Amino acid sequence: MRVRSEALAMFSALGFARTLIRPVGAPSPGGRRNRFDEIYQSFARLRALHTFIQPPLRTIDQTDMTDLLAATLEHLETLVSFDTRNPPRAIAAEGGIFDYLRAQLPGFQVEVIDHGDGAVSLYAVRGTPKYLFNVHLDTVPDSPHWSADPHVMRRTGDRVIGLGVCDIKGAAAALVAAANAGDGDAAFLFSSDEEANDPRCIAAFLARGLPYDAVLVAEPTMGEAVLAHRGISSVLMRFAGRAGHASGKQDPAASALHQAMRWGGKALDHVDSLAHARFGGLTGLRFNIGRVDGGIKANMIAPAAELRFGFRPLPSMDVDGLLATFAGFADPAAAHFEETFRGPSLPSGDIARAEERRLAARDVADALDLPIGNAVDFWTEASLFSAGGYTALVYGPGDIAQAHTADEFVTLVQLQRYAESVNRIINGSH
């Protein structure tokens, strides 16, 4: 296993050297393949095989369940029972899940703040910790496809099922269990507004400027430290046309829907042109036209249309520049162009600053003996901490593929590994 770890470390180093020797996305002179590309691809093939040479995952039964995992499951069962679906943004500061957490953290200084509209934060500190753990307690709404009550956790074989067990109440339960397994220094920030895309809890915390060496944000990363992910931007556009009968010759700008479709073609072409942009293992720009509304019937020129789109940039991309480019594709100019939500990339900053912050997060992961995973496409609030000046990484149990799904689950192995790692960080040598 040591050989495999060293090979993976060399793979990461080669990837970084590759970007230094030849600018990302640029061809080698004369079209010749860069020698570093050949070496890098060889290690990429070795890396792809590493999962097959790992020891098989051991399943956990009742006889070999650790006390820490048993405590984690007990807390998780209770946390799942609290309805923290978001929307409808109806989570209260008093009673319910926050009273439970306060009661489970004896010896901590606990502060609960209601930021309005279902945004509640619980900040708990014991001693003088170096690291802050952040977990959101809200979940997405359940769907009709659940096979049983989503707020009643149930165990099936090697996993537990329930709304939020993977995203991300399992991490909250493990942190509480670890906190009660010893008396080490610890700091937790629990929040309830992550799924609302209105991060009041994090904004209020950042305004305080409290000193921490790093922030570990819990999201489903399969127990690996994620150092980089995409940002996110959501946009609302409105197009204005002129109503009329569709039988006549039309001015190109007469139909608001035609304007929207022409805009979409230009936008998609631009996205294709960015396919070779790269940062930390991520490539290209993720882009989606999610909804188009407008028009009345087939023989009427559409007087108005509304379009919603979103994109997920690389940490190295200029979001304001992308927005200006997308707005400029509207001809005539869109009647309305509004960015409705923005989440920065992780790490934040320009290319040089982002890389500096990524390396700082890597050093934290190494110091805490956390395995380092690949960059991911999904967005997390770790980027908000990074933009606020903290070294931040994403680390939690579970697979993102299970988040937001019916019969959401997390495996016992994932919960136990995460619980053991945070217990070591809180009560061990770190």
Predicted regions, residues:
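N-terminal polybasic/positive-inside topogenic patches
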Residues: 22, 28-31, 44-58
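Active-site metal-coordination/substrate-binding segment of hydrolases
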Residues: 132-190
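Metal-dependent amide/peptide-bond hydrolase catalytic core
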Residues: 67, 114-115, 141, 233-430
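Low-acidity, Ser/Thr- and Arg-rich intrinsically disordered low-complexity segments
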Residues: 2-5, 12, 47
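Glycine-biased, low-complexity coil/linker segments
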Residues: 1-3, 30-32
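Acidic/histidine-rich catalytic neighborhood of metal-dependent amide-processing enzymes
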Residues: 164, 168-234, 279
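Aromatic (phenylalanine/tyrosine) cluster motif
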Residues: 11, 16, 36, 40-43, ...
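N-terminal helical capping/dimerization or prosegment-like subdomains
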Residues: 64-143, 304-308, 322-325, 412-414, ...
